[in-house]
A protein has these predicted regions:
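Mature catalytic core of soluble alpha/beta enzymes
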Residues: 2-9, 14-343
Length: 343
């Protein structure tokens, strides 16, 4: 139901404590810069050796993912990766063998495109490139030519044009270019949870640029997530998140440029070829981090008119969006969990 409010953007404000930790264990915070953002892992009530072993394994995985999941062929200091090789093969109309982990993720992305009615589209790479959002160091100063945008839309790039023979992939559509940015964080969070569990970590919070997942509990309680104003650090509401749940947010504050007083954000509507304008933020809480990641993007594209239907189609119980006018639309599950600061 819509609720009048100031502009909100879901963000993560963590309050961590560990009273009663014994002398052998304590809390550790490790931070890295990876995937173009800040990655923070808060280990709760662990030994130093346990956290160190987990971090070493995470760093190894980061290096592999950062290299292999970048969709474009050139990036300073980064070797040619697997998704870039796949995109080059698709452009050439050639088949290519795909690693099992990435093949499973691409198949999942294609299913999510179908389930969201194309609002999430993993084949949108050329449009992302056209708008310049693939290179944060060189964002555009102005929108691309409208003719080029319409040409991309007319090409109907979609994962439905991917053809599989086992784990060998090909496509007869040269307009298809894979960009898994809309689900990558969700998959990475799930992989990191597995790594932490394998290394004996029972309680932690993993945060990748504001998208997070909770492992276990915080001092025996659910984690508290703050929703704050986009222009200040004021906390407007609190949300409790249980162990095993992920909180994924998509918003117009992550990557954008301004032209003639108008903001152009990185979340693009595949149906029009243009950045989303009606909605500034979408947040989804779900045990399936990949689903939550794609759903946050799809809800941002769907906007207030498509919010209820898409939540029903995807089985989302805890979700909200914030419109450009500052209204909040949320599911009943989200409404029950939120604790408004002013109430």
């Amino acid at each position: 139901m819509p609720v009048a409010a100031r502009h909100l953007i879901a963000a993560i404000l963590l309050s961590l404590a560990c009273p009663g930790c014994d002398s052998q264990t304590r809390d550790f915070r490790h931070q890295f810069y990876a995937f173009g953002t800040l990655l923070t892992i808060d280990f709760l009530d662990v030994t130093e050796s346990t956290s160190a072993a987990a971090i070493a394994a995470v760093e190894t995985r980061i290096s592999k993912i950062d290299r292999n999941w970048y969709p474009w062929s050139t990036r300073a200091g980064v070797p040619f990766g697997e998704i870039a090789e796949i995109n080059d093969a698709i452009a050439a109309g050639q088949p290519i063998a795909v690693s099992p982990v990435l093949a499973a993720l691409i198949r999942r992305a294609a299913l999510l495109e179908s389930q969201t009615g194309g609002r999430f589209n993993p084949a949108i790479g050329r449009l992302t490139e056209l708008w310049g959002f693939h290179d944060l160091a060189r964002l555009r100063a102005a929108p691309p030519d409208g003719i080029e945008i319409q040409k991309w839309v007319a090409g109907r790039a979609s994962s439905e044009y991917l053809e599989w023979n086992g784990n060998v992939l090909r496509s007869n559509s040269p307009d298809v270019m894979l960009d898994l940015g809309g689900i990558a964080k969700g998959s990475i969070l799930e992989q990191f949870v597995t790594i932490l569990r394998e290394n004996g970590v029972d309680n932690a919070i993993i945060d990748i640029g504001g998208d997070l997942t909770v492992v276990g509990t915080v001092s025996g309680r659910p984690a508290r997530i703050g929703i704050r104003s986009p222009r200040t650090d004021d906390v407007l509401a609190w949300l409790e998140v249980a162990g095993g749940e992920a909180v994924m947010t998509s918003g117009d504050y992550e990557r954008f440029f301004e032209y003639q007083g108008k903001r152009y954000q990185h979340v693009l509507d595949p149906r029009s070829g243009y950045p989303v304008q009606h909605t500034v933020s979408a947040t989804v809480v779900h045990a399936d981090a990949v689903l939550a990641d794609a759903a946050a993007t799809a809800l941002l594209v769907a906007g207030p008119d498509g919010f209820d239907r898409l939540c029903a189609d995807l089985g989302l119980d805890v979700a909200l969006i914030v419109t450009v006018s500052g209204d909040v639309r949320l599911t009943r599950g989200m409404e029950k969990r939120l604790h408004w600061k002013w109430r």
